[in-house]
């Protein structure tokens, strides 16, 4: 089993994925995050927040404390696309991620039909993804209060090359930005199950302005120092959607 602590799991996911690669027990991903991205009516999304706080938070916290989950968290939309809320949990394998998704909600709502119905009414549609945690901030990293998440649409036949470019260019630069205090953490993750997005880059920091500034400085660095590789990356992953998330709950 890969060993992964809070700083790795959460930094990878919204922060989540160094050095340019996390130390692992083998060559596989450090973990797998099951993420549910919710479409909510802005008039009712507060009911989802209440359901998480009242019905789910204590159970998720206990699962983490008991070692059933590596980490979990809940995020609120600030800026970006149509997703309004995101909830995630991290497991050591993809099979565990799938099984834990079913088991924990069965535990929470088995005897609370009304709570489950209220939750569904608050956010009536969602997208599920499983992300493999591949590159990002290493052990001992505390992530920030907000996350800039960039969801990339990539050529499935060449996306592994995009991973190599990140490891060679932007990854080391993000490590330096973290050491310099410009960002709190960063991550790079790959699609395993879900919709059209194939890669996810995350940067966390103290506030929205700082993570946006950091991304702008990363663009400038790439254009000035790795312009050909930056063009190659854009050719592989030519479309993306940006989100700014506020981190509402997380454990450990």
Language-model features, listed with the residues they occupy:
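Short S/T/G/P-rich N-terminal loop/turn motif that feeds into the first structured element of a domain
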Residues: 22-111, 117-252
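Bacterial N-terminal signal peptides that target proteins for export
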Residues: 1-9
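Bacterial N-terminal signal peptides
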Residues: 9-18
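Glycine-centered signal
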Residues: 2, 20-22
